[in-house]
Structure formats: C-alpha cells, structure tokens
Amino acid sequence: MNDITDPSLTTPRAMSGRGNRLSADDWAQAALDLIAEQGVGAVAVEPLARRLGVTKGSFYWHFPSRDALLQAALERWEIFEQKEVFGSLEDVPDPSARLRALFQLVAHEVKPHVIYSELLKALDHPAVRPVIDRVSQRRLDYLIASFRQAGLSRTDAQHRARLAYAAYVGFLQLSLQLQQPKQAREDFEAYVEHVIQTLIPG
C-alpha cells in the first residue's frame, strides 16, 4: 500500500463550525487515528481530549467509559469497510472485473489497513477479537463468492480466497510490522498488477 490516505478516515477538526462541540463520531474517529499511530493500548481519554482541543467533559457527554469509545471506534472502522469498500463494488457486474477493482481499491487505501494491522496485535483484547473475526470471515466469504462467480469450483475458490487473503496479511506484516523498505511507486504498482494477474481468473 502506498501513501494515499482515504478522506473518510481522517482526523476531525475540533471546534470546526460547531463551537467546541464534538460528536461521538468525532471521538471514535480520533480513537481510530490514535490506533493507527500507536496501537489499541494508546487509546485513552486525556490524550484524545488534548488532541481534539476539548475537555474530558466532552468525552463523557458521549461515552461512559474508554471501553465504550473503543467499541464505537471499532464499529466505525467495520462499517467503513462494508460501505466504502464492498459497497462501492456492487455496481461492477463482471466478477473478474469486480475482483480487480477490489484488489486495486485495497492496494491504494492506507489507513484502514494500518488500523487492521494494529488490531491484529491486540487480538487478546475482548473488544478486538470479535470484530477481527467478523471482518476476516466477511472478507473471505466475499472473496470465495467472487471467485466462484468468476468460474472456479467451490474448492478452488476457497483455496484462491485464502491465498489472496494470506498475500494481503503477509504484505501488511512485511510493510508495517517488519518495516521492510518502502517500494517505489512503479515497483508497488507492478507488484499489485502481478498479484492481480496471478490470482484472478481470466
């Protein structure tokens, strides 16, 4: 993934056109930004309040606890994927073209994947594991269905979906956790095209 950041997952500006009032969504998005930067363990009320330029009272207006905020942040991330990723592909009728569009979309949206990588490090957290399980299963189911529609048998579609997902998670590990050198843009684009040509039928 390169350095293109999706505008739907950017930090809210405190006191932007609403005085000093922030919504619950603003707090949830700020928590996601902090997860992307420092991990789940960094989510806390005081640093988020400082980041947003408000008092802790604004937080407690919307959430009873830090755990409630974390749950809202995870739900926001999950809903974003359902609507902005899978939802954006509903109008692509050809299954192979839909898979190609999915691979390109996933390759060029950075922040959701950084968040996912950080969540994988926190699977022992009781709020994180159920979300990761749902998201991972939904992704695999979508891939299996798409590969089936593209002409593969059920068994081959399952194998291809797992291979595609393993390539995705493995790339995250190499890029974000093992901190391999960042690829030049042309090299990255060539890699994405190679993955597409290797995994997508026809």
Give residue spans per PLM region:
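Solvent-exposed, amphipathic alpha-helical segments
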Residues: 26, 30-38, 84-88, 118, ...
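Short, solvent-exposed amphipathic helices
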Residues: 131-138, 142
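Hydrophobic alpha-helical connector segments
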Residues: 72, 83-116, 164
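Hydrophobic/aromatic-rich alpha-helical bundle segments in the mid-to-C-terminal region
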Residues: 129, 133, 148-202
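Alpha-helical DNA-contacting segments of helix-turn-helix folds
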Residues: 63, 70-77, 84, 131-132
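N-terminal intrinsically disordered/low-complexity leader segments
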Residues: 1-22, 152, 202
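Helix-turn-helix
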Residues: 26, 30-72
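Amphipathic alpha-helical segments used for helix-helix packing
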Residues: 109-133, 177
